[in-house]
Every structure is written in C-alpha cells, then in structure tokens.
Amino acid sequence: MSVTLHTTHGDLKVELFCEAVPQTAENFLALCACGAYNNTPFHRIFPGFMIQGGDISLGPAPGTLNTLKPMLPVNEIPKGGTSIYHPRALNQEIHLPALRHNARGILSMASRPVKDRTAPGSQGATGATVNGSQFFITFAAAPHLDGASTVFGKVLNLSPQDEGGDVLSKLEKAKLKVDKKGRVTQPKEGEEGGYEAIGINSVTIHANPFAK
C-alpha cells in the first residue's frame, strides 16, 4: 500500500506496512484521506538522524476533518495532534526483528508518554507510550529506537535515479532556522536570511485497504 507526500521540496513516495501494523496504518491513511496532514510543517529536524512532522494541530485542517469519527472537531484538536481513535489510545505496534529503524527512509511514529490512563488519547493504553498523528522519517539507521517507536513504512525514492528523485536529501539539506532542540521556525514573508519553508502540502493515496 502506498501514498505520496507532496512536500515543499518534492514528492516522497512511501510504502506502508498495513498488514504488519494495521491500526497504525489505518490511522495514518485516515488522516491522509481527510486532509489532516495538508499544509502541516515538518517541525523538527536533526540532519543525520531524522525529520518529524504530522502535528495536525499546526496546520489549517479542512472542515472535513470533523466528519472523521471519533476524531475531535477541528477546533478541539489538542496541541501535538491526536489519532483517529481519540479519546482511546493508539497503542504501539512493535514488531522485532521484522520492523526496525535499520536504514535511511524509515517511517515511524513519534510517541508520547502516558501520564494519566484516564485522560483523552490515553484511555486503554497498554504501555508507557502511545501514538497520535505525528511521525518521523529517518535520515540514517537509528537502532536505539527499535522497540520504542512503531515502524509503519519506508520511503521508496532515495536516490536521484528513483522516480521523483532523492527528495529526502533535499529536505535534510534545506536552509532552515532551527534551535538546539531541532525545532524549526518557519520563515515569515520578507524575512532576511534566505530560510526555507518545509512541510507537507498535500497527500495522494494510491491504495487504501481500510477505505469503506
């Protein structure tokens, strides 16, 4: 199953591991389908490690998002985003050694700690962390994340010869304003310094086994 992330720096063609991690894949595809990722930034980056995006609270999500049940209405999406299962937890789907952070271009969920198992988004949590809408893509193998984050896909175009070209390298080398914690400040119109905007413009779904 595949999608294309149309980014500010070109198209990332992504294969999803729907059979191995069905809940994670369904969550990602549903958020893609309703436009939740449209016009959202990549808000963290560490060249040589990873780039992170998918915070649906940061983008101008369309009104269609509130038709995705049990998703919250657009104006009630919590800071950091949430999964389609809200207020229930989207638990980790760890599969070792089959799915690991063992290469460049691995797509994985950015988890958050569970502080209160009765809180919205954490209800029914089975582990110390849960997933929401945020994800990251590795720039290199990151074995220290194995067992901690859910791998659910991989980027297919990783070289200049691949269809679409090596877009991940363009993102990694973009001229950005970044703080010590890797947080990206998107440039303002007319701002000096030549900084680039970086994010997801839209998503095309090529196959969705969960569509009804």
From Swiss-Prot:
Signal peptide: none annotated. The lineage of its organism: Eukaryota, Fungi, Dikarya, Ascomycota, Pezizomycotina. Disulfide bonds: none annotated. GO terms for molecular function: peptidyl-prolyl cis-trans isomerase activity. Belongs to the cyclophilin-type PPIase family. PPIL3 subfamily. It comes from the Eukaryota. Its EC number is 5.2.1.8. GO terms for cellular component: catalytic step 2 spliceosome. It catalyses: [protein]-peptidylproline (omega=180) = [protein]-peptidylproline (omega=0). The keyword rRNA-binding does not apply. Keywords: Isomerase, Rotamase. This is Peptidyl-prolyl cis-trans isomerase-like 3. InterPro entries: Cyclophilin-like_dom_sf, Cyclophilin-type_PPIase, Cyclophilin-type_PPIase_dom, Cyclophilin_A-like. Residues 1-198 form the PPIase cyclophilin-type domain. It is an enzyme of class 5 (isomerase). PPIases accelerate the folding of proteins. It catalyzes the cis-trans isomerization of proline imidic peptide bonds in oligopeptides. GO terms for biological process: protein folding. The keyword Isomerase applies.
